[in-house]
Curated annotation (Swiss-Prot):
Region ranges (Disordered): 1-22
EC number per UniProt: 7.1.1.-
Note on cofactor: Binds 1 [4Fe-4S] cluster.
NCBIfam families: nuoB_fam (TIGR01957), PRK06411.1 (NF005012)
Record key words, sorted: 4Fe-4S, Cell inner membrane, Cell membrane, Iron, Iron-sulfur, Membrane, Metal-binding, NAD, Quinone, Translocase, Transport, Ubiquinone
Name of this protein: NADH-quinone oxidoreductase subunit B
Keyword Cell membrane: yes
Binding site for [4Fe-4S] cluster: C72, C73, C138, C168
GO molecular function: 4 iron, 4 sulfur cluster binding; iron ion binding; NADH dehydrogenase (ubiquinone) activity; NADH:ubiquinone reductase (non-electrogenic) activity; quinone binding
Role this protein plays: NDH-1 shuttles electrons from NADH, via FMN and iron-sulfur (Fe-S) centers, to quinones in the respiratory chain. The immediate electron acceptor for the enzyme in this species is believed to be ubiquinone. Couples the redox reaction to proton translocation (for every two electrons transferred, four hydrogen ions are translocated across the cytoplasmic membrane), and thus conserves the redox energy in a proton gradient.
Protein encoded by which gene: nuoB
Intracellular or extracellular location(s): Cell inner membrane
Length: 194
């Protein structure tokens, strides 16, 4: 039963996986019964997909951001991007006040040596998966104050940064583009680990 005898050696049948390596689709997906069920569900508003794709889709469409505003970029760039003209919420990105409810931290402004431990503490309070957008020249590399003794030359020395948004101050379009790139990165990686 299921075993074949070949030169006095018992050989088990080749195990079948869930995904067919030739097509990349689930085994049996070309079955007429499966196709019929899929066609019946298509016109009723149902979607047949994998759990991983569903979780990734939900994660990209419901990012909650908080700002770590240190200087002018926090006021100028984020307020403009959140206003009615650009409206970041239509892209599935909504503001939150607490790091424990946030997925994305937007660091905007000059990070000083005194504020670096606070930035790390806030970052550590965020739940996994967490992402960081560095916004503006000062957060990216120190900006005008790069050679000051009191300035950290980029917030990536304190927390891992996923997206860099250049500019002094960056435009609202640049910030929105950074958010869209982050959503694309989440869709591409699809896992909690970076």
């Amino acid at each position: 039963m299921g075993m074949s005898q070949n030169n006095s050696t018992l050989v088990a049948p080749q195990p079948k996986g869930i995904i067919d390596p030739a097509t990349g689709k689930p085994v049996g997906s070309n079955d007429a019964y499966f196709t019929e069920i899929n066609d019946e569900l298509a016109d009723k508003g149902f979607l047949v997909t994998s759990t991983d794709e569903l979780i990734t889709w939900a994660r990209t469409g419901s990012l909650m951001w908080m700002q770590f505003g240190l200087a002018c970029c926090a006021v100028e760039g984020l307020m403009q991007a959140s206003g009615p003209r650009y409206d970041m919420e239509r892209f599935g990105v909504a503001p939150r006040a607490s790091p424990r409810q946030s997925d994305v931290m937007i660091v905007a402004g000059t990070l000083t040596n005194k504020m670096a431990p606070a930035l790390r503490k806030v970052y550590d309070q965020m739940p996994e998966p967490r992402y960081v957008i560095s916004m503006g020249s000062c957060a990216n590399g120190g900006g005008y104050y790069h050679y000051s003794y009191a300035v950290v030359r980029g917030c990536d020395r304190v927390v891992p940064v996923d997206i860099y948004v250049p500019g002094c101050p960056p435009t609202a379009e640049a910030l929105l583009y950074g958010v869209l790139l982050l959503q694309k990165k989440i869709r591409r990686t699809g896992t909690i680990e970076r």
